[in-house]
């Protein structure tokens, strides 16, 4: 009887061992299959604001298809969700922001996104609202500017260049300035900080507005043609728009394919002919 029980137990142990072994092989095969599938993934998903970023991406679709990739462009209308989606793994890259904004986003959110490569810059402009020119601006007039750190600095520097305000010494394009850094405001201007995407709509309610290049383009405004004054080109180049990815993925096959397609003569020609100075390539 003891021998019979021992034999049964030994058989059970043997069966368990075989089952465990079989499970390990199955799991290993599944993992290998998953890795292979990931390696075969030829869809590049990029988040972008509609104008000009999504339009520029779409101009590169054919070049990517020639390399065996499908480009999936996901459009966003604000400056936060494209980075959040990239951090969460919903995107392979995004294309909407300049380096100072990206650095500030990482700092404020504890994220680790990286600029994969440079693309273009969009000059900021001051646009007429209820007041038609800088010369006609009256005491106490209202001016709308973007409320996010790096772009607010950019707007304030432009107002300073226009002779409307004076900022503290040391404020430059890399600073994180607000209207509290204004030291002189001779016309007692009412400077209103609002979300960048709302700036074009604010023109009906304010005397002037300093508008980001992409949102100006969406409102059929061209900084080179329609603004009262555009920012210093040296400042503008500090704010080069980049394609961003998760840190460590800058040299991945997808990002390098995207770089090759976007930094092409065909895309440069498309940008020059389409935006006529409102978007300036840097490659």
Annotate each language-model stretch with its function.
Residues 104-116, 130-131, 205, 210, ...:
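Ligand-binding "clamshell"
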Residues 2-24:
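Sec-dependent N-terminal signal peptides of Gram-positive bacterial secreted proteins and lipoproteins
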Residues 153-160, 262-283:
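Periplasmic-binding protein-like
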Residues 123-134, 239-252:
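A bilobed periplasmic-binding-protein/Venus flytrap-type ligand-binding module shared by bacterial periplasmic
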Residues 116-165, 268:
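A conserved helix-loop-strand patch within extracytoplasmic ligand-binding domains
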Residues 39-51, 69-75, 142-143:
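Short, well-ordered beta-strand elements
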Residues 73-84, 172-201:
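Short helix-initiation/N-cap motifs at beta->coil->alpha
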Residues 17-40:
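Bacterial lipoprotein signal-peptidase II cleavage site
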